[in-house]
């Protein structure tokens, strides 16, 4: 044993070293340890402890001094222990060397085959892709129901349909090739497009659920089903108004100049149906209210720009095509009766819209997702929006009641309901509650609107049963005669291959009819009357060809009576 080993220093048996802390010395069983200890006690000297100095020798690296009577068993260091540096041996009082550890970087873990998505605060959301596809599917079902309600209406042409189809005696384009069926199919396409645009506008203003409820209620209205099966420009005018409304909602966060996209649609609507002119001020107000939350004072610039461009386009249209006729015709209808009829045709939807407006004013959001970020519209803006949408439904009834003219009021009511229905959809959504807590309320409202709409449409959609009359006239008309009838447009349309529209004249009653009969200038006279007029009773110039009664006895239509010149 060297001096350094006796002083507690380090031994250097070779390049390999060992630590006592990790590799304790080898010991014999308990019996040998007791024997060695007994020998140490027997001498009574410090030699026993001197023998224990061999234990200190075991602290050398790569070398072990066994106890007396013990076999030598060397211990080898591992590969990781060979990184320790040579210790400092400056003297007997030198401190033990602190080894420097080599930190090994862990191997990178393999990429997982599947990563769980981030867990949202709630397991429910209204703005994910799945809800969007569900909304589209439900909208398609709503449009199919609307198409079915319109297709169930059938019959010969109305007088206004025939006038629209003849177009001053000349058919053109798609109508010329497809006739009445093609024109009605085109009207249905416009009506379905208006419902789809209404859903889009309501979804942008409120949410998808309110949009679906609004589209569902609008699709079963009597005016919607009627215009979808009525060959006229009313459905086109509704489509243009719905497109303008959707564009106003779509561009509410854009620059004020983006509102110019909606101006052409709004300006064209009155030239398709004059009643659409009543709703241009509503569109102007909505141009401001829809953008005020995002643009502030810039929303008024947007409204002024929309009003100016729309007015300029309307003025140009009047200069080119003239003023639409029929918008200010006075009548003798009872104003009270017109208001009652309007309440029957649109009262249910208007009531639900008022409920939705009140709920919207009281609370901006329903609270299904209280953690949703974003500022809510103010109470004043909510009040103005609800008042504008609900009040618009009253424009056509009040205006025509003031005129005393109930012509096509059952159709014009639908123009105002186009603007009130978004608030009605919001009302249905609020009444069902958060997360569809009370779905039976929405189902009940929809079924009630459906039943009422079907009954009213069947009552109002009663075209003249003119098939038998047209069949009888085919045998007596030609391109040279003159004909007097109560329905000149219908006769001119169905007999357009045999006659010209100018050959058909509108029949009057009283002295005018008596004078025409006495003059004998008409080759045939066709009247819808329950009894024979006095002027034709016993007349020697005309003979009665036939009396054609309608197939629908409950329709209230008078039979056709045909006289031909002798």
Predicted regions and their residues:
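Aromatic/acidic, Gly/Pro-rich catalytic loop(s) in extracytoplasmic/lumenal soluble domains
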Residues: 96, 114, 517-566
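Membrane-interface helix-loop-helix junctions at transmembrane boundaries of multi-pass membrane enzymes
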Residues: 203-205, 209, 255, 291-305, ...
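Membrane-interface transmembrane helices that cradle and orient dolichyl/undecaprenyl
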Residues: 208, 244-261
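Membrane-interface alpha helices of multi-pass inner-membrane proteins
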Residues: 214, 258-274
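Hydrophobic/aromatic-rich transmembrane helices and adjacent perimembrane loops
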Residues: 227-228, 234-237, 278, 402-436
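Perimembrane helix-loop-helix junctions
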Residues: 250, 279-309, 327-333, 363-364
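Signature aromatic-anchored transmembrane alpha helix within multi-pass, membrane-resident enzymes
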Residues: 374-382, 428-455
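Short periplasmic/luminal acceptor-recognition loop of GT-C membrane glycosyltransferases, typified by
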Residues: 456-467, 473-534, 554-556
